UniProtKB/Swiss-Prot annotation:
Protein's UniProt name: Tyrosine recombinase XerC
Single biological process term from Gene Ontology: DNA transposition
Encoding gene per record: xerC
Residue stretches making up the Core-binding (CB) domain: 1-81
Role, per record: Site-specific tyrosine recombinase, which acts by catalyzing the cutting and rejoining of the recombining DNA molecules. The XerC-XerD complex is essential to convert dimers of the bacterial chromosome into monomers to permit their segregation at cell division. It also contributes to the segregational stability of plasmids.
Keyword DNA-binding in annotation: yes
Originating organism: Chromobacterium violaceum (strain ATCC 12472 / DSM 30191 / JCM 1249 / CCUG 213 / NBRC 12614 / NCIMB 9131 / NCTC 9757 / MK)
Coiled coil, from the record: none
Oligomeric form and interacting partners: Forms a cyclic heterotetrameric complex composed of two molecules of XerC and two molecules of XerD.
Main location group: cytoplasm
Cellular component GO terms held in the UniProt record: cytoplasm
Compartments in which it is found: Cytoplasm
Length: 299
C-alpha cells in the first residue's frame, strides 16, 4: 500500500471511523492507485480522475458507487492538502454522473379504486385494514406517519387529520368522505386495547407496526388481483399522481404531502389552508364531499 494511503487510513482510524468505513476508503483509494498504473494516486490530476470516473462508468458501475468512490478520493486529497502535501484538491470540482431517477410507481385511478373496494370481510382486522389503506390514499401518508397516528389526531367534526411528518413537522390534511366512513366503522369495531392511544391496533391491542401494514397490503393486493408488489408508499405515490392529474397544482400537493421543498432548487412554499382544502375537495377522486354528520362520534 502506498505510504500516503496508509497514513490517511491511520488518520481515519484515530478519528474513530468504523472498520467497515476504513475498509471502504482503503478499497476506493487503492482502486484509483491501480488505475493510475505507473503514477501514484497522490499525484493524480483532475483530468486523470475524470478519466478514471469515465472508465468506471463505462464498466457499468452505478452512479451511487461512483459518487462514493469520488467522495473517498476527495477526502483523501483534502487530507493531503491540509497536511501540506498537495497544493490543490483535484477531486474538488468533479462530480459523479447523476443518478438515474426512478419514477415512483403509482396505481392508476381505477386500479386504486379496485384495490380499495375489494378489501372485504367482516372481521375487526378487515375493518381496520379498510380504514388504514383508505386513509393512506386519502391523505397521502407515509408508512411511518400512518403507524404513528393516535386517536386524537383525527378531527371528526371537520374531517381533518393531524400528521406528524419528517423532522417533527406537523400538517393538517383533509380526510375524504370514503376514508371518514371507513374510520368510523373501524372505531366502532375497535374492541381491544381501549386505553391504547394508537389509532390502528394489532391483534393483541397494541400499536400496529409498519411491517404488519406492509404485509397486510401485500396480502390484499395478491388476493384482489392488484399484484404482489403493491406497498403502502405506492398508495402515497398514487395520491400525489392523481391529485396532480386532476388539479395541476404542484404547490398544493407539496403541502399535502409534507414535502419541505418543491424541488431541489426551490424553498418550501406555504399555502393558505383554505386553498388546500378547496384543491383537495375538487381534485381527489375519493373526496368529492366531506360530510359532517350530526351524530359525530369523536371518541
Amino acid at each position: 500500500m502506498d505510504e500516503a494511503i496508509r497514513r490517511f487510513i491511520e488518520h481515519l482510524a484515530v478519528a474513530g471511523r468504523s472498520p467497515h468505513t476504513l475498509a471502504a476508503y482503503r478499497a476506493d483509494i487503492e482502486l484509483l492507485e491501480n488505475m493510475m498504473q505507473a503514477k501514484s494516486a497522490r499525484d493524480a490530476t483532475a483530468a486523470e480522475l475524470r478519466k478514471a470516473l469515465a472508465k468506471l462508468h463505462a464498466q457499468g458501475l452505478s452512479s451511487r458507487s461512483l459518487a462514493r468512490r469520488l467522495s473517498s478520493w476527495r477526502q483523501f486529497y483534502h487530507w493531503l492538502q491540509r497536511n501540506g502535501e498537495r497544493e490543490d484538491n483535484p477531486a474538488a470540482g468533479l462530480y459523479a454522473p447523476k443518478r438515474d431517477k426512478l419514477l415512483p410507481k403509482a396505481l392508476p385511478v381505477d386500479g386504486t379504486a379496485a384495490l380499495l373496494d375489494r378489501i372485504e370481510g367482516e372481521s375487526e382486522l378487515d375493518a381496520r385494514d379498510r380504514a388504514i389503506f383508505e386513509l393512506v390514499y386519502s391523505c397521502g401518508l407515509r408508512l411511518s406517519e400512518t403507524v404513528a397516528l393516535n386517536l386524537d389526531d383525527v378531527d371528526f367534526s371537520d374531517s381533518l387529520l393531524r400528521i406528524r411528518g419528517k423532522g417533527g413537522k406537523e400538517r393538517l390534511v383533509p380526510i375524504g368522505a370514503e376514508a371518514m366512513l371507513r374510520l368510523r366503522t373501524w372505531l366502532g369495531e375497535r374492541s381491544a386495547g381501549m386505553d391504547e392511544p394508537a389509532l390502528f391496533l394489532g391483534r393483541h391491542g397494541h400499536r400496529l407496526g409498519g411491517r404488519q401494514v406492509e404485509k397486510r397490503l401485500r396480502d390484499w393486493a395478491i388476493k384482489t388481483g392488484a399484484g404482489q408488489h403493491v406497498h403502502p408508499h405506492m398508495l402515497r405515490h398514487s395520491f400525489a399522481s392523481h391529485m396532480l392529474q386532476s388539479s395541476g397544482d404542484l404547490r398544493a400537493v407539496q403541502e399535502l404531502l409534507g414535502h419541505a421543498n418543491l424541488s431541489s432548487t426551490q424553498i418550501y412554499t406555504a399555502l393558505d389552508f383554505q386553498h388546500l382544502a378547496k384543491v383537495y375537495d375538487g381534485a381527489h377522486p375519493r373526496a368529492r364531499k366531506r360530510g359532517k354528520p350530526d351524530d359525530e362520534n369523536k371518541s
